[in-house]
Amino acid sequence: SSVEEALIEMYLAGVSVRRVEDITEALWGSRVSPSTISELNKKAYVNIENWRKRSLTGRYPYIYVDGVYLKRNWGGEYENVSILVAVGVAEDGYREVLGAQEGMKEDKASWQSFFKWLKSRGLEGVRLVVGDKCLGMLEAVGEVFPEAKYQRCIVHFYRNVFTVTPRGKMRDVTRMLKAIHAQETREAAREKAQAVVQKLREMRLKEAAKKVEDGIEETLTYYAFPSEHWLKIRTNNMLERLNREIRRRTRVVGTFPDGESALMLVCARLRHV
């Protein structure tokens, strides 16, 4: 019924169960019990799972990956659970949420499982994986997508350098980092990076210099692809915005009773993107 659909939509939109009860009482004069809401959610879960496990067709040269952390109840204790998310760009430029899967944490085993699951559903043609540098991702990409390259998000790279940069020198360092990725060729970017590392050492920012020196190469992969794609494939901003929306929607829930309910609510939002 339309009433049932409204209740499901309220919950999936991030409205708390208590708030749903209050709304139903205000609208219809009687409160809908938590058990009724739970039963309706089970119906919604079937539809969400069908979407989550759908077959993938076509080729996706670029995929963006990230993890969003939510709180869940684990044996009476509360801990974070990571929901791994992937968005693909097809050959015609169309963007699509490829899938989401629960990962206890962002490590090699979780990423490997996630990538293999995507491949089992038909994902192919991957040439570039864009994401933040996190434990095990690079190794998982190499094992599951051996023909693909890895692009470290330059925004996350900058933020990592900023963690060891004094506030008073932040503006200068930002300008220096952006100058690297403003170059027209990878070779020119490497030369600029060397100059930036030297300048940072002269500024007595040895830790920042080391982070740039150690991590810059992973941020330059995009130069191997068409220049008209560079601005889009060198950052994970698209998925970052999506994850912020997920966090906003799930914040009202607080702690999820289990990983399954967290995954369901995340996918309910993703399938309408």
Residue ranges and their predicted role:
Residues 2-14:
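Short, amphipathic alpha-helical "recognition" segments used to contact nucleic acids or chromatin
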Residues 4, 17, 34, 38, ...:
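Amphipathic alpha-helical transducer elements in NTP-driven molecular machines
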Residues 12, 182-273:
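Acidic/histidine-rich catalytic cores and adjacent linkers
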Residues 18-29:
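DNA-recognition alpha helix
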Residues 27-130, 135, 139, 143-147, ...:
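RNase H-like nuclease fold core
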Residues 42, 58, 93-96, 109-116, ...:
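Conserved phosphate-chemistry cores used by DNA topoisomerases
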Residues 103, 172-176, 180, 184, ...:
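A short, charged helix-loop
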Residues 128-135, 140-176:
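Conserved beta-strand -> loop -> alpha-helix junction used to position metal-binding or nucleic-acid-contacting
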